[in-house]
């Protein structure tokens, strides 16, 4: 049996086409979704991510605003910029590109963003609402992962989901989202003693650890859905995931590739959250 490849780029394009239609309808009502992205410093990777977000906004018809600030900016000045955007009716979503310079406390910055504009889903209020199953902006990568699993038409309810990794950005929230879908969830991490045995119990395996090709066929239950969140660059310059794709291909039922797997879904869910925020605000642009 060879696994079915879940092509995240194709799923993302399909969802972006749906978002484009929604944005057209909103604009007919005088509502223009708007996303502001704050970029501090000149980190090339961050700039590349921001460019992808701008391109996504342009594709679906979202107004985007890039605020570029020097690496030397004070925390107070950055907080003031967020306050300005919180009060700007043209802006439905605010995203601060991480990481930030060491002299700025990320927690304080994230908490300053209005929960109504927290399209990244990182604000403590958003996290609390997610934990209790309330309507909120879901974190983009975890939300994208759940959407990819749903593409397999597998009934998530009652399935055993194993999450390898416990970061605040992916591991912890993705487990909670699957719990909200009535799955049974097990977390594995660096201190887990029997990771291989646990991962072999997974109907759905989510891997987000940042270690190239760590997960091999002997970690996989036959027919499992395998979602590889890792993006690692080998010495050859080639990108690979945390899962040894070729090794696992004959055991898994479904698998995401790297690249063109989870990555394209992250920005797509950010666009989704921005459109949802615009719908909730319902502010007609003059």
Curated annotation (Swiss-Prot):
InterPro entries: Aminoacid_DH-like_N_sf (IPR046346), NAD(P)-bd_dom_sf (IPR036291), THF_DH/CycHdrlase (IPR000672), THF_DH/CycHdrlase_cat_dom (IPR020630), THF_DH/CycHdrlase_CS (IPR020867), THF_DH/CycHdrlase_NAD-bd_dom (IPR020631). Its EC number is 1.5.1.5, 3.5.4.9. GO terms for cellular component: cytosol. It holds the Pfam family THF_DHG_CYH. NADP(+) binds at residues 165-167, 190, 231. One of its GO terms (biological process) is purine nucleotide biosynthetic process. HAMAP family: THF_DHG_CYH. This is Bifunctional protein FolD. It comes from Bacillus cereus (strain ATCC 14579 / DSM 31 / CCUG 7414 / JCM 2152 / NBRC 15305 / NCIMB 9373 / NCTC 2599 / NRRL B-3711).
